[in-house]
């Protein structure tokens, strides 16, 4: 019978962000493969421990609730991340984690550089144009090739609508995270 890792129960902090999921074992020494939800998995790689929850739908898991997984090593590998964790010492233990969702507290993310933003910080921000006209609230961001696009949700005549604005300096004048607002050079009829 395979030896399953012993994981410490933990509370999921209110600022926890889902950053990826464990997809498979990698090798025979307990390493496992992770699908990061960002093209730049910096927050995942910088964390000394991850919070895991079982897969949402249908997958079997040997643990319930939230558990703490101390990370020994993590690095990028092609378009994924491979990691090795404390207590995960062979392929069977790594396979037992398959499907687990990975969370990291937002407070533990590395500091973003100038004019760099974590998507999680932009979602929910109201967007106004230079004239102060409300254009909507950021509902999502889409990678659209050379740039990212803001997806705004707004209502018009009582019906929900979407508006898309390229997230580039030609249209985005200011992102004020402290003031919780994005100002753009955009009109409601675009």
UniProtKB/Swiss-Prot annotation:
Keywords: Chaperone, Cytoplasm, Ribosome biogenesis, rRNA processing. Coiled coil: none annotated. Pfam families: PRC_RimM (PF24986), RimM (PF01782). This is Ribosome maturation factor RimM. The keyword DNA-binding does not apply. It is found in: Cytoplasm. An accessory protein needed during the final step in the assembly of 30S ribosomal subunit, possibly for assembly of the head region. Essential for efficient processing of 16S rRNA. May be needed both before and after RbfA during the maturation of 16S rRNA. It has affinity for free ribosomal 30S subunits but not for 70S ribosomes. Belongs to the RimM family. The lineage of its organism: Bacteria, Pseudomonadati, Pseudomonadota, Betaproteobacteria, Burkholderiales. GO terms for biological process: ribosomal small subunit biogenesis; rRNA processing. One of its GO terms (molecular function) is ribosome binding. Residues 114-190 form the PRC barrel domain. The gene is rimM.
